Amino acid sequence: MTAPAAAIRRLDAREPEFLATLDALLAFEGGADARIDAAVSEILRAVRTTGDAAVLEYTRRFDHLDVKSMVQLELSKSELKAALDSLTVEQREALRVAADRVRVYHERQRAESWDYVEADGTRLGQKVTPLDRVGLYVPGGRASYPSSVLMNAIPAKVAGVGELIMVVPTPNGEKNPLVLAAAAITGVDRVFTIGGAQAVAALAYGTQTLPQVDKIVGPGNAYVAEAKRRVFGTVGIDMVAGPSEVLIISDGSGQAGWVAMDLFAQAEHDELAQSILLCTDAGFIDAVAASIERLLPSMPRRETIAASLANRGALIHVDSLEQACAIANRIAPEHLELSLDDAEPWIGRIRHAGAIFVGHWSVEALGDYCAGPNHVLPTMRSARFSSPLGVYDFQKRTSIVQISEAGAQTLGRVASILARGEGLQAHARSAEMRLHDR
């Protein structure tokens, strides 16, 4: 079989039209798909109306599982343990090491309640409370990712979520033991073998068997993403993620083959994934391009990689690392690699990135699985205003207001003036009724 061509655009940041070309390269519109929109709308309506019956029907239709009740689609704790026990020693150890590292990192994120007391006895504070119940969607079939279980379940558990319910499709009854083992290791409370928009609907609205959750997290296909988008407001969601992204900043000090493979690691996700190199050394860019040509034929997913690099990839020559950092902040990538011998001084120049991987040894793939920080990161330039998934996404904050009698005298007058200025007389009088000299 002929290997696919490894075409990837070459750009020069000194060209007058560079920024316009870059913005066009970055532009990604998922686009409204009328077929997906209509299908998801009908599925949500059916599940909301009939509950278990609709979920069973869609599971029969899409996953080819013909069961009589939702009880048959729930896995027991013993089944999860059996999946864990079925793994090789190496697989079990890898899952445990990764889980431990993710847990240690996320334990540092746990927010605590606080308060303070003013001179007149007024107490103000913030109460931090974990969510009661969270739903975790995990893809099934060919796209089975135990790492997604670790990255979503562990921060929820660290936050103290009361109940964590996982849904994972099992087409034709095929279960992925790594995914179920990850659920066992992380302490997922309940697991249902359902998927698609019907699983999102069941989590969002509740059914006769599956209770309504407060928030839904986890990746999925276009139907899952659209369902999450539609149920937002009824429940919380983590994000609606776009294609995976990596941006590598290099001064030519690394190994070209390493950089090429790091670009591949994103490109193999799908044809819309984005892999970009910013480099000050034109000769090194040539070496990376040559490495891409040399290494691509050996990759099992070479067709996907080639299409991704051709569609949305770029090798960009920049004048300086200062310019590279400015461009990086414009891109606001999901993953940013500082592939530099002396990377530390440049961390402070980066304002917008989901995660920064510092130095030649900090390969992004380690962050996907076992470094510790979360791999659920903002995409599509949303790192300008959003953050990685973390413990804080599974906690909520409540303000505590305890006004003393003395405090009510001072604050009551302030509130009265402002309320009357807004034309809200009941607000003003409510405050004034607490005043001693009213």
Curated annotation (Swiss-Prot):
Cofactor(s) listed: Zn(2+)
GO cellular component: cytosol
Top EC class, one word: oxidoreductase
Binding note for cofactor: Binds 1 zinc ion per subunit.
One Pfam family from the record: Histidinol_dh
Residues given in the record as substrate binding sites: S244, Q266, H269, H335, D368, E422, H427
PROSITE patterns per UniProt: HISOL_DEHYDROGENASE (PS00611)
Binding site for Zn(2+): Q266, H269, D368, H427
Keywords annotated in UniProt: Amino-acid biosynthesis, Histidine biosynthesis, Metal-binding, NAD, Oxidoreductase, Zinc
Keyword Oxidoreductase set for record: yes
Protein's UniProt name: Histidinol dehydrogenase
Protein source organism: Aromatoleum aromaticum (strain DSM 19018 / LMG 30748 / EbN1) (Azoarcus sp. (strain EbN1))
Gene from which this protein is expressed: hisD
